Amino acid sequence: MTIDAQKYDKIARTVFAPVFPLIADQIIAYTGVTQGTCLDIGCGGGYLGAALADKTDLFVRFFDASPDMLEITRRTIAENELTERADTLQGNVTAIPLPDASVDLAVSRGSIFFWEDLPRALTDIHRVLTPDGWAYIGGGFGSKAITESIVSEMKKRNQGSDEFRDRVRRNLGPESRERFETALKTAGLDRASILHDEEIGLWIIIRK
């Protein structure tokens, strides 16, 4: 699926702005990972990775299939003065161009819903995790209140259409959870679980 990088980024930088620091806090609280290498998969403009870098000592590797998105990410890196603590990497999540056991924390928000071969992607994410590594991958907006606020704003921007609300419900609903559970079983990832509620959204947790 082709995404208009500039259009997507405009929304991410404005409407979605409150989401990233809150999710970063939730990731840190759940995993306890604050040092080492973080891989932000399907990073878009890099806002989740930047929020994690701001709150930790992590080196963040921003990973996306889109060169246009990575151009935006490089701007985010510069704006947040992260040039010594970050880099960018282009590629596909089913064949991450990194060595085995090289990532302490893999994160991804929103990208997973575009992954066509989910079991293969999860398998490769597991491959790059260090022996004590974590992956925190899925979708959400940090809280129910923020979700409702964003849905309302997007409805205004879409001339009253509920298309965005419907997509959120679909992505964070039971069908997506079932798809995630099936993919984890297919991938044979025993040390994995799913977090799912209306506050935090829908997330896959993987331990090495």
Model feature map: region roles:
Residues 1-34, 47-51, 163, 198-200:
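Conserved class I S-adenosyl-L-methionine
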Residues 203-208:
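C-terminal lobe and adjacent flexible extensions of AdoMet/dcAdoMet transferase-like proteins
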Residues 94-105:
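A short acidic, Gly/Pro-enriched loop at the edge of an enzyme's catalytic core
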Residues 11-16, 138-197, 201:
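C-terminal alpha-helical "lid/dimerization" subdomain adjacent to the S-adenosyl-L-methionine
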Residues 119-131:
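A short glycine-rich, Lys/Arg-flanked "PGG" loop and its adjoining helix->strand segment in the class I
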Residues 105-118:
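A short SAM/SAH-binding and catalytic strip from SAM-dependent methyltransferases
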Residues 37, 132-134:
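Short glycine-centered segments of the SAM/dcSAM-binding site in methyltransferase folds
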Residues 37-95:
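Class I SAM-dependent methyltransferase SAM/SAH-binding core
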